[in-house]
A protein has these predicted regions:
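FIC/Doc superfamily catalytic core
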Residues: 1-345, 350-526
Length: 526
């Protein structure tokens, strides 16, 4: 294999890197130096590290600048070690790098320091990503080190030892699909809140009848919201069917067959939709009105890569199921990875959000019988949701070579499978955690409090006037619409039978029952 690179030097002095401005003039190091030197066609890591010309450290959202004394040796080995030490694992960059660095050159790198922790980790990763064994001797009796640094990124709590490399494989996925999540202060703070325990406390303090009604409302609301996100307005029957599927999430193991079963439920009328894995290209976007050529916002994985990628998704779910990783940290990479792959012609978005419910339920994160209305929270945060989706899909557009087909589709011309196997899902976890927090701190307690207030109102009303439940619902609806007052129209029509004294008592009862409550949003209409 011929090594491709720009000149002899790896590092160079820059004020910006591939369109990303630097806080000051720096020398590239680690992944930036490797991407530049080997001309790797990869999405930039969310955060890069460089060497400042000054003796101070700078830490921003997209750059970590270290002092001159941290400058790595300007070699392949030097920048790889620097990357692992300061930038954690980026499997997409490493996979691309390993395609252009020969086995012979890489074997020499490992042989130069056979007992070194970084060399052993890189040796394992090289063989793990390429599927080819290197001609490298055993490192002898040395302490096994984790492949993924658990202080930098989330990995398996108990990894799998590799006696050949003297490392512990704690990667959350397999070479077929392995998105990673960095440990950030934001995620650590979200985990520390113990939102799952907060939800169980709310449920434990709620009467079973109230809880059953609240759970049913939240489940249906989530189902409707998931359709609304896709710009659809489902019939009541279709929303109920999908709500039932959401309620069963986590009860069956994942498989391609299970995804196809769920697709049939979510699509309903499949006369004009090809069910099952795509057999041609796919994209998200629009068409030029004059030429009908695609205007993609996101390009899906190639059809010939779908079987391997979906096997990877299933394997990831199995591998992390009892991995000791926080459930939300697992759910986001799985769900967003699925939607980037976009394996089906239709239904991908709703299945992607179903995967969130699947992961949380399988991990026991939500109380039994209660579904957090994550889709409803996403619908409220739709602009942020789209921004998170585009944080990875937009950079990919510049890396994917494609041409339009005669049917208005796209045909991808270059190799893209690794773009869907490996990506940084940190931003996705932070967003999903905000949505989960909303459902637990707002939706669930507000719905419970509202139903408890309604129960007080309904029970108290029977002491004023005998009224069937259907009429109580209508009276409550009118009072809610007018902030606790009955309109003249309702007073002279539907509730003309109420005396003035009864009406005064009814309005006072409504005020006493609902005073101080933050009322939940009205349910999305079907």
């Amino acid at each position: 294999m011929q090594t491709k690179h720009k000149g002899d030097r790896f590092s160079r002095v820059v004020n910006e890197f591939h369109g990303r401005e630097t806080p000051e003039r720096i020398s590239t190091g680690g992944y930036a130096a490797l991407i530049d030197h080997y001309d790797l066609k990869v999405p930039l890591p969310p955060k890069l590290t460089g060497i400042s010309e000054h003796h101070h450290r700078v830490d921003t959202d997209h750059w970590l600048l270290l002092t001159p004394r941290h400058r790595p040796e300007d070699t392949l080995a030097g920048h790889l070690e620097f990357a692992l030490k300061w930038e954690a694992l980026d499997l997409g960059v490493l996979a691309s790098l390993f395609e252009v660095v020969s086995d012979k050159e890489f074997s020499a790198l490992v042989r130069a320091e056979p007992t070194g922790a970084y060399a052993r980790r890189l040796w394992f990763l090289r063989e793990w990503l390429t599927g080819r064994q290197l001609d490298v001797p055993s490192p002898g009796k040395v302490r096994a080190v984790p492949v993924l640094d658990p202080e930098q990124q989330f990995g398996l709590a108990t990894g799998i030892p590799s006696s050949r490399h003297k490392v512990i494989d704690n990667l959350p996925g397999t070479p077929a699909f392995c998105p990673l999540v960095r440990r950030t202060a934001t995620i650590e703070a979200q985990i520390a809140k113990g939102l799952d325990h907060r939800a169980r406390k709310i449920v434990g303090n709620t009467h079973p009848d109230i809880l059953t009604r609240a759970a049913a409302f939240l489940l249906l609301d989530d189902s409707k919201a998931s359709f609304r996100i896709e710009g659809e307005q489902p019939s009541p029957q279709r929303a109920l069917r999908w709500g039932k599927a959401i309620g069963e999430a986590g009860s069956r193991p994942l498989s391609v067959a299970e995804f196809e079963r769920l697709q049939r439920i979510v699509i309903g009328d499949s006369r004009f939709t090809q069910l099952g894995l795509r057999t041609e290209g796919g994209f998200v976007g629009t068409h030029d009105r004059r030429t009908h050529e695609p205007l993609p916002m996101h390009i899906s994985a190639k059809a010939e890569d779908l079987s391997s990628l979906m096997e990877g998704v299933v394997a990831y779910d199995e591998r992390v199921r009892r991995a000791g990783i926080d459930a939300v940290v697992i759910a986001a990479p799985l769900a967003f990875g699925f939607v980037y792959i976009h394996p089906f012609e239709d239904g991908n978005g709703r299945l992607h959000r179903w995967l969130i419910h699947h992961t949380l339920a399988a991990a026991g994160y939500n109380p039994p019988g209660v579904v957090f209305p994550v889709s409803a929270a996403i619908y409220r945060e739709i602009a942020a949701y789209e921004s998170v989706l585009e944080s990875y899909s937009r950079p990919l557009l510049g890396l994917i070579e494609w041409e339009p087909t005669r049917t208005g589709n796209v045909r991808v011309l270059n190799t893209t499978v690794n773009y869907y196997r490996f990506f940084d899902a940190t931003t996705h976890v932070e967003f999903l955690y905000r949505c989960v927090e909303q459902t637990i701190e707002q939706d669930l307690p507000q719905e419970v409090a509202y139903l408890e207030a309604y129960e007080r109102f309904s029970t108290g009303l029977q002491d004023i006037v005998d009224m069937p439940e259907r009429k109580i619902d209508l009276l409550h609806k009118f009072l809610r619409q007018q902030s606790g007052r009955l309109s003249k129209r309702a007073r002279t029509n539907e509730f003309a039978a109420l005396t003035d004294e009864e009406l005064e008592r009814v309005e006072a009862l409504y005020h006493d029952s609902f005073e101080g409550l933050v009322l939940p949003r009205p349910q999305l209409e079907s």
